[in-house]
């Protein structure tokens, strides 16, 4: 579980993906932003890749162009962890227990949180 690379989408998303993947495209893109970022992500997905839509922080939900999906044999998957808990709380509990077991057994590890200083933005 994890990512090979993390990209700042505000700094040339497509160019960064091309550089990191030797022009192949990303196998998986996790998109909590939607809107223009989703549109650009669709152009960055590798053949048979998956684009995970987990939110629309931009305020504009994702709208998939099916021609991009067909050309690349790619998938767009919508996911929210909250819905799983509401639809099947027992499933969510079982999965949580499995993850905690893996953590206790050392099969997975948690990363140490990294911090950054938050500065209050001056009022206009």
Report each predicted region and the residues it spans:
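Active-site capping/gating segments
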Residues: 81-93
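Acidic carboxylate diad motif detector
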Residues: 54-55
